[in-house]
Curated annotation (Swiss-Prot):
Cofactor: Mg(2+)
Known regulation of activity: Allosterically activated by GTP.
Gene that this sequence comes from: upp
Species in which this protein is naturally found: Francisella philomiragia subsp. philomiragia (strain ATCC 25017 / CCUG 19701 / FSC 153 / O#319-036)
Annotated protein name in UniProt: Uracil phosphoribosyltransferase
Domain of life: Bacteria
Record's keyword terms, sorted: Allosteric enzyme, Glycosyltransferase, GTP-binding, Magnesium, Nucleotide-binding, Transferase
Length: 209
């Protein structure tokens, strides 16, 4: 599995701000969007270009570069993934949205699916899954499995922080996906939370406890 940890200074700086205990909901939400935007820029760096003819500003036909045949659906894992969508839309405003509801049972740490609304022609689209945390990998593995069953063939993932345990589990289950993350953190604690992590990203994005 391709794993890319984005080590750009702006990404690391913004992520460092997000780790603070006293961070406000507004600030956490803003930084989530900004980091997602920077990571999306990295994800799309591998997209192929082709020449297209357009009518230029002087009224004459000119050749310009355009992304070649790429259709994209952004797939937020509810609910925390919703906070990352605007960061993707800054670069791909026409992206279709496919939503997957997946939560982690706090007692068993196992994923539980409760919702899926996917766009059409998944076999023709890049599916970009967004979720702030890759902890055990369970929810992400189930989401990828769901997308593949629906026809997805090209799946990329953006997370803010990832645990080594989750990366290993995801790689074993789906070695053909690509993971882009702002940080590979140290480990999972006994409650399966990422250390040092961000705490509960969903609660911090939506201002709930």
């Amino acid at each position: 599995m391709k794993v890319v940890e984005i080590k750009h200074p702006m990404v690391k700086h913004k992520l460092g701000l997000m780790r603070a205990l006293a961070i406000s909901t507004q600030e956490f939400r803003r930084l989530t969007k900004e980091i997602t935007s920077l990571l999306t820029y990295e994800v799309t760096a591998g997209f192929e270009l082709e020449k297209t003819e357009i009518l230029g500003w002087q009224g004459e036909n000119i050749e310009v570069d355009q992304i070649k045949g790429k259709k994209l659906t952004v797939v937020p894992i509810l609910r925390a993934g919703l906070g990352m969508m605007d960061g993707v839309f800054e670069h791909v405003p026409a992206a279709k949205v496919s939503m997957v509801g997946m939560y982690r049972d706090e007692n068993t740490a196992k994923p539980v699916a409760y919702f899926a609304k996917l766009c059409d022609k998944l076999d023709e689209r890049v599916a970009l899954i967004v979720d702030p945390m890759l902890a055990t990998g369970g929810s992400m593995i189930e989401t990828v499995t769901l997308l593949k069953k629906a026809g997805s063939k090209d799946i990329k993932i953006i997370t803010l922080v990832s645990a080594p345990e989750g990366i290993e589990a995801l790689a074993n289950a789906h070695p053909d996906v690509e993971l882009y993350t702002a940080s590979i953190d140290s480990h999972l604690n006994e409650k399966k939370y990422i250390i040092p992590g961000l705490g509960d990203a969903g609660d911090k994005i939506f201002g709930t406890k």
